[in-house]
């Protein structure tokens, strides 16, 4: 049985989520108070409905409690976002992801029980900034305030060495959890694995330790 998702708020972020989920082949219900936006996504989502998500009866009648995951992507109206999240929690929705506008909004969402809170603009800005500064870093994902996961292209200083030779965990406190080599992905590589030039290393660790590794081994400023 396919998982069912609902996206409430069809602005730039919510619309992108709706499209991405639809492309994955899952059932998606798209909802917005703006009729034009709903019409725009009528052919993309499995169902598209006009409705006020701050009205508990509307969410009940739509059967939101039966959905596996609801994404609250309401734009500028923080009050509507908070109230919608509260109603969804009271309805017993299994998983709720909410777009936060600022740190205050995030704190409130956390207190009322949102399962996942995202800051799309802030998070994307951090990824772009990190990628600009670090030429060897292909991608950057913030896991928490202190830890990140990055994709690093192996340079000549790393190539030809085994993971044991480099001893990255002991020296820098970070872990190489996978290696992408062409179309091959080596998950949990052995200590005897030799790194090739242009391998993509999937590294996880604290932001401070990853930065230290980049500066000393990858020669980033």
Swiss-Prot record:
UniProt binding sites for NAD(+): 12, 32-34, 52-53, 74-76, 99-101, 105, 121
Pfam families in alphabetical order: TrkA_C, TrkA_N
Keyword annotations: Cell membrane, Ion transport, Membrane, NAD, Potassium, Potassium transport, Transport
Gene null: resulting phenotype: Impaired potassium uptake.
This protein's record includes keyword NADP: no
Signal sequence, start to end: none
GO terms assigned for molecular function: monoatomic cation transmembrane transporter activity
Membrane topology of this protein: Peripheral membrane protein
Subcellular compartments: Cell membrane
Domain RCK N-terminal: 2-118
One of the record's GO cellular component terms: plasma membrane
PROSITE patterns named among the record's database cross-references: RCK_C, RCK_N
Top-level division of the source organism's lineage: Bacteria
Main localization of the protein described in the UniProt heading: membrane
The protein's role, per its UniProt record: Catalytic subunit of the KtrCD potassium uptake transporter. The 2 major potassium transporter complexes KtrAB and KtrCD confer resistance to both suddenly imposed and prolonged osmotic stress.
Assembly notes: Homodimer, tetramer (dimer of homodimer) and octamer (tetramer of homodimer). Part of the KtrCD complex formed by an octameric catalytic ring of KtrC and a membrane associated dimer of KtrD forming a potassium channel.
Family according to the record: Belongs to the KtrA potassium transport family.
Descriptive protein name: Ktr system potassium uptake protein C
UniProt organism field: Bacillus subtilis (strain 168)
């Amino acid at each position: 049985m396919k998982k069912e998702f609902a996206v409430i708020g069809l602005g730039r972020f919510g619309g992108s989520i709706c499209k991405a989920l639809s492309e994955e082949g899952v059932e998606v219900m798209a909802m917005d108070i703006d009729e034009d936006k709903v019409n725009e996504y009528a052919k993309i989502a499995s169902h598209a409905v006009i409705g006020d998500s701050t009205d508990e009866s509307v969410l009940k009648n739509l059967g939101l409690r039966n959905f596996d995951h609801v994404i609250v992507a309401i734009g500028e109206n923080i009050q509507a976002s908070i109230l919608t999240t509260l109603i969804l929690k009271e309805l017993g929705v299994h998983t709720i992801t909410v777009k936060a506008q600022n740190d205050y909004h995030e704190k409130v969402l956390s207190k009322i029980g949102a399962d996942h809170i995202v800051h799309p603009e802030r998070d994307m800005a951090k990824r772009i900034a990190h990628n600009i500064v670090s030429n060897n870093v292909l991608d950057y994902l913030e896991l928490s305030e202190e830890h990140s996961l990055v994709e690093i292209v192996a340079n000549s200083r790393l190539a030809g060495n085994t993971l044991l030779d480099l001893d990255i965990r002991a020296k820098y406190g970070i872990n190489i959890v996978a290696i992408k080599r062409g179309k091959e992905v080596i998950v949990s590589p052995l200590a005897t694995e030799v790194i090739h030039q242009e391998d993509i290393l999937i590294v996880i660790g604290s932001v401070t330790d990853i930065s230290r590794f980049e500066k000393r081994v990858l020669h980033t400023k």
